[in-house]
Amino acid sequence: HNGTVPRDHWLEEWEKESIVKFWYKNPLEGYRRCTYMMMDQDIVAVSPSSVYRVLSKAGLLKRWSKKESRKGSGFEQPLAIHEHWHIDISYLNIKGTFYYLCSVLDGCSRYIVHHEIRESMKESDVEMVLQRAKEKYPAARPRIISDNGPQFIAKDFKEFIRISGMTHVRTSPYYPQSNGKLERWHKTLKGECVRPGSPLSLQEARELVEKYIQHYNEKRLHSAIGYVTPMDKLEGREN
């Protein structure tokens, strides 16, 4: 058969075994992402529904999935890269000490433009994170999307945004899921990187997160952008 064309009507035993084996190695990826990863790696070429059936029969899939509310989903989706940059702050617990992770995510490509882990995250720290993101893409004039945290409502931050040639919009306090892309990213990072990696120091955490973000940006296929990597999407290689 043509190995590049997914089949849905029959599977050979070796293909079923390969699917199950691949799932055990990548249990956090989800069956759809695994389908495209297996195609990319020339393991098997079958449809997502076939992968779902094989994994369901093997008892490997959860029977439920949490549906996200569409209510207050916020802004229209960006049509181009560097149109929307989402910024958010999250806590990282490293051996009982809390540090601050601030990430900047491109809304179109899901690419992590910049991130920093710091011992404090005042308004001036957030400015520095955004400034370094801008230095990577000097021509970008994104709309910055944030929540209503004190760093983002400060007068100095508003002035920084104006001087930098960017614009800023804050999510509704009642519908913070408008910044859900970045909140999901932070949840994924903690679940797949920080907690399993159990870093023992701030420096170790920084190295661990840096390595994971490189994998996420350059290797991991993203379901929301058509199962290409964020870097492929950012650089126009999705077709």
Question: PLM features: residue spans?
Answer:
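Short small-residue beta-strand/loop micro-motif enriched in glycine and branched aliphatics
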Residues: R110-H115, V169-T171, R195-P196
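An active-site-proximal beta-strand-loop segment
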Residues: H84-V113, E119-M121
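RNase H-like polynucleotidyl transferase catalytic core
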Residues: R143-N148, I163-K181, G197-L202
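Acidic/histidine-rich, metal-coordinating catalytic segments
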Residues: A139-A154, V228-M231
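Basic, flexible linker segments flanking DNA-binding modules
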Residues: H1-H84, Y175-P176, T229-E238
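Active-site beta-loop-alpha junctions of metal-dependent nucleic acid enzymes
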Residues: T97, H115-A139
